Amino acid sequence: EFGRLAAMKLFMKKTLTKENALMYGVGHGGIEAVLTAGILYISNLATAIMVNTGSIGAALGTLDEATRAATVESLSALCTTDSYLFFMAGVERISAIALHICLSYLVYRALRYGEKRYFFAAMGLHFAVDAATVLLAASVPILALELILLAAMAVVVWLVSRLYKAEASPAPEADSPA
């Protein structure tokens, strides 16, 4: 959250509005989605194409024995992964983007109005989601975990949207006479 705070202070001084805070969250969550899931799935897609076209053998043939064995082991894991798990990454990213939008609004609110409790709420919320994910991942099936996180994010979005709607929007500037 300190990164959000610094970015808003440094780069959004003149444009710090509640709407821009939401867009900051969309950008933050979106780039994280691209960097974490997007690039991985492009790699998975390229690998699947190589396997399905039969060109994987030629690629494996260029590797030394140890690297080839490790690559074959990775391919086996990829090929035996249940297909719904690839879908679950998308569900997880939806929750993550919603979280980043909400966190960005809370940090904006703390900065814009000096309401430090919203900054601490953002920090606590981010910690709680990350901690719950780590703790539950070892004991709860992935589908249940993602549904729990999705439900939690729905509640967070509802609460933050109430704050957002309660905040007055600035009056539109009057057109200057020509």
State what each model feature region is:
Residues 70-102:
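Alpha-helix-centered segments that form part of catalytic cores
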Residues 158-174:
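Membrane-interface capping segments at transmembrane-helix boundaries
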Residues 1-11, 24-25, 36-40, 104-108, ...:
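Generic transmembrane alpha-helix signature in multi-pass membrane proteins
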Residues 26-70:
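Transmembrane alpha-helix/helix-exit interface in multi-pass inner-membrane proteins
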Residues 10-19, 112-116:
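Juxtamembrane helix-boundary/capping and inter-helix hinge elements in multi-pass membrane proteins
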Residues 22-32, 123-127:
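Transmembrane helix-bundle signature of multi-pass membrane transporters/permeases
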Residues 3, 37, 41-45, 78-83, ...:
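Juxtamembrane/disordered regions of integral membrane proteins
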Residues 89, 93-163:
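Functionally important transmembrane alpha-helices
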